[in-house]
């Protein structure tokens, strides 16, 4: 992306110190971009990136950060399903109002934007509701204000460096892959909410990062691209994921655990089917290059085995 008369390429990544964010930053750096990371507190970004302290809820700091960028990938947000149901306001303020601040700044400076959204946008939990709201605002900005904005609906991203929840890590949000792997590696049974028939689409985090950057480049070249779905299209039940993890942990460590079922958590659907359509990735030319689930689980088990040592 050519900068505004400066001859450099600079991308701002909000939430660039998060799980997907760090991979997106590394992908950008690998392609030769100058990268700034917008974060609320000091955390060392990926090597080669510049940290910009700021909160997306603060329109002034967002506008200032965007004014120095040639492109924006917006990932910052408050996560959680059952964790945010009893107190949705913080997530709504950050995800919706903060997201609007990012959209307004990008529209003001005519900067191409890629906004991350969720595959389960129809679910009645705070995260899905707030992320879908911003996705709708993107559509409004594109249609009525001529903004160069594209949505990437990320399905269930997983991989090394994903933060585990207690007792294995500091995350307040329990994610399926680190939870399953950490429990299995420590000899604890894998816990599944519901009967495990829920269908998910697991996508390796490096593939998500590649899609985000490719979407930004295409938006810069050709304008708004509508919606890309960052998913493999592979229908995998939660039970399938658990048994793949059990098998891989047994292969790498010799430890064998069982799978147990618990009641469903609030905010989740026992019969959910959340699948991406990789055909949407055709314009990016990467739909058939996604890492198979078995290979991604093997890489993830290797990482968490070292993490837990």
Regions found by a protein language model. Name each.
Residues 1-160, 299, 303:
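N-terminal Rossmann-like NAD(P)+-binding domain of SDR-like oxidoreductases, especially those catalyzing
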Residues 3, 42-43, 181-182, 219-220:
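Short secondary-structure boundary/capping segments
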Residues 51, 73, 80, 88, ...:
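Generic anion/oxyanion-binding catalytic loop in active/binding sites
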Residues 60-63, 82, 89, 100, ...:
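Residues in well-ordered alpha-helical elements
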Residues 102, 138, 180, 280-282:
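Structural element of the ATP-grasp superfamily
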Residues 126, 132, 136-200, 205-214, ...:
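NAD(P)-dependent short-chain dehydrogenase/reductase
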Residues 185-189, 193-309:
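C-terminal substrate-binding subdomain of Rossmann-fold SDR/epimerase-dehydratase oxidoreductases
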